[in-house]
Amino acid sequence: MSISKTLPYNAIEQIKSYLLQLQNTICVLLESIDGKTRFHEDSWQRAAGGGGRTRIMTNGNVFEKAGVNFSHVSGEQLPASASAHREELAGRHFSALGVSLVIHPQNPYVPTTHANVRFFVAEKEDSEPVWWFGGGFDLTPYYGFVEDCEHWHQTALNACLPFGETIYPKFKRWCDDYFFIKHRNEARGIGGLFFDDYNEISFDHSFELMRSIGDHFILAYEPIVARRKDIPFGNREKAFQNYRRGRYAEFNLVYDRGTLFGLQSGGRTESILMSLPPTVHWEYNWHPEKGSDEEKLYTDFLPAKDWLKKE
């Protein structure tokens, strides 16, 4: 493996090929799981440069709304959300490629999930390109199951182990910190992996890590869906799901870096906001019943912890 951080001449083509394949693979698997509804594809172009391929599934047997979006956009200047902590990026033109997905299930016992893998490069004449990878995946249950959390985090560990024993704890902690709703003082879910600004060792090494995380997502999510999708539920569980979806919407509209980047860079609004739940309910000063399964989400699952099963 090369130890140079030089960007290969065909880096964009390599990454784009992988991302399109990843989008296809995930969509085929989700359609197979759902068994009723197929993805609607919407290809789009961005006037300032680039475009994408948005795929949306709605009102399925298993998935109430699922979006799997590929985008490849470029521009003359990075928006503030991407350059605020990297002053050396000022005045550089950029390219950004990624696959981002959010899945909102019908059954409240099936968790919502989000995953994203992406690549940025910022270039300037007579200067070396500045590039990095980012992404991760995280899980947002409404009703917690220890075995699901353990499986999710074990799969996250498996994605990271080929790249060293320090990667998983670092990316896990980063995920816990990132997906925290500060104004509510609570986590969005039970975490997973999150990383950004990653360009360690070489392009090949960094690209392989991004691919590993992308490829492990469906391995983490599919078994959980299979275990929970047929559990009976009623109005109480659906109401709690819609209430908790409000937290999801709050995070995405207030804090999410990808949402801010997309809106600030003149991205396609429909694709950027595909992450929002189809139905949401806010209730003033609501609190779960003492000892209820709803309360256990707050006490036993949302606080950050080590979910790896002890041997």
Swiss-Prot record:
Active site: H114 (proton donor)
Residue(s) at site: Important for dimerization: H183
Domain of life the protein comes from: Bacteria
Single GO BP term: protoporphyrinogen IX biosynthetic process
One Pfam entry name: Coprogen_oxidas
UniProt-annotated location(s): Cytoplasm
Cofactor: a divalent metal cation
Pathway: Porphyrin-containing compound metabolism; protoporphyrin-IX biosynthesis; protoporphyrinogen-IX from coproporphyrinogen-III (O2 route): step 1/1
Reactions catalysed according to its record: coproporphyrinogen III + O2 + 2 H(+) = protoporphyrinogen IX + 2 CO2 + 2 H2O
Keywords: Cytoplasm, Heme biosynthesis, Metal-binding, Oxidoreductase, Porphyrin biosynthesis
Chief localization: cytoplasm
Gene3D superfamilies reported for this sequence: Coproporphyrinogen III oxidase, aerobic
Binding-site list for a divalent metal cation: H104, H114, H153, H183
Positions that bind substrate: S100, N116, V117, R118, G266, G267, R268
E.C. numbers: 1.3.3.3
MF terms (GO), sorted A to Z: coproporphyrinogen oxidase activity; metal ion binding; protein homodimerization activity
Any one of the GO CC terms: cytoplasm
Important for dimerization as annotated region, ranges: 248-283
NCBIfam families registered for this protein in UniProt: PRK05330.1 (NF003727)
Assigned protein family: Belongs to the aerobic coproporphyrinogen-III oxidase family.
Function of the protein: Involved in the heme biosynthesis. Catalyzes the aerobic oxidative decarboxylation of propionate groups of rings A and B of coproporphyrinogen-III to yield the vinyl groups in protoporphyrinogen-IX.
Self-association and partners: Homodimer.
HAMAP family found in the cross-reference section: Coprogen_oxidas
Protein name (database record): Oxygen-dependent coproporphyrinogen-III oxidase
Lineage: Bacteria, Pseudomonadati, Pseudomonadota, Gammaproteobacteria, Legionellales
